[in-house]
């Protein structure tokens, strides 16, 4: 079995550079300092196939998934309900529509309540 962890974003809730306030203490000449908001891709592969689970759906998710060439997810784990961890959820629709298959979601009850209020359309059966 092989596990691969890909950091899709590691910036703060506003990303780096921040809109309106720039780079802070980060050196703008270093390309690694341009950071998207937090998301992590976990891939497990073995002789039976591959499983991909995304940790959090940052507002930068569309670009993150395109850059990582992700064409399917088996699941999404939400760590908590803050906007910088959840507001990319709509970008999952393209995967669901294309594959005509739901994506399993893992989250605690407070996060589930918040997401059902904000994004009810994501949790209905088409």
Where are these regions (language model features)?
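Binuclear metal-dependent hydrolase catalytic cores
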Residues: 1-126
